[in-house]
Amino acid sequence: EISLNGYGRFGLQYVEDRGVGLEDTIISSRLRINIVGTTETDQGVTFGAKLRMQWDDGDAFAGTAGNAAQFWTSYNGVTVSVGNVDTAFDSVALTYDSEMGYEASSFGDAQSSFFAYNSKYDASGALDNYNGIAVTYSISGVNLYLSYVDPDQTVDSSLVTEEFGIAADWSNDMISLAAAYTTDAGGIVDNDIAFVGAAYKFNDAGTVGLNWYDNGLSTAGDQVTLYGNYAFGATTVRAYVSDIDRAGADTAYGIGADYQFAEGVKVSGSVQSGFANETVADVGVRFDF
């Protein structure tokens, strides 16, 4: 069985003092298409593979070529993936819940380097031998994640740095908890990073959450992000503040809103200020298919 899914988005993006000779405000867009193939045995074991095609404004034509494939097998709550895998740190719940705007961005995200699913074709060839293994297990509201990434599997392991990650999350109708830990994140020696998050849904319309990050070797140090959202009918208002343990850094913050036109179609906007007091803003439309 073959299926297609993805999304398109387009709108205005503003970055204060983007660069010498560069416009601060541009039209920003993306088209993402996932090609997913699955089959199931008589015993109920599912085998699957995924390829992604993605174009962002500014990409060369090669940017729309398929990325590296991901393969998986799943049975009774256990999924084992190989290839271009979703890593534990990038997959755990809550870590991206402060994001806002049609581009889904936030200064409240982790400021560290770590491996994640590679969405695009790598024209440089740097990822030709990148490979990983990931295992997930789900039961009774608990999700467990384990991942391993070798950035170049053809080179002796003593000459490259491999990333190992573990994570878990749990949720009921009101409370969500999550945690993750990764060693040598992003293939950087001794770049050990961590995350702990909690969220409380105080009614059907509103949620508040608190995330803590140890950003490893990043100059950001420890980071705390407080965020919340509240829905008024078809409109959802979002806000966050984030602080890092770096001398002279400003407190980052953002406020945004979504309006749901229909299922899978929304207009979103945000205004955010970063750790260097830089201002970014966006407004645009996203539609899922």
Curated annotation (Swiss-Prot):
Pfam families: Porin_4. It is a multi-pass membrane protein. The keyword Transmembrane applies. Keywords: Cell outer membrane, Ion transport, Membrane, Porin, Transmembrane, Transmembrane beta strand, Transport. GO terms for cellular component: cell outer membrane; pore complex. GO terms for molecular function: porin activity. It is found in: Cell outer membrane. Transmembrane segments: none annotated. The keyword Ion transport applies. GO terms for biological process: monoatomic ion transport. Homotrimer. Forms channels that allow the passive diffusion of small hydrophilic solutes up to an exclusion limit of about 0.6 kDa. This is Porin. The gene is opmA.
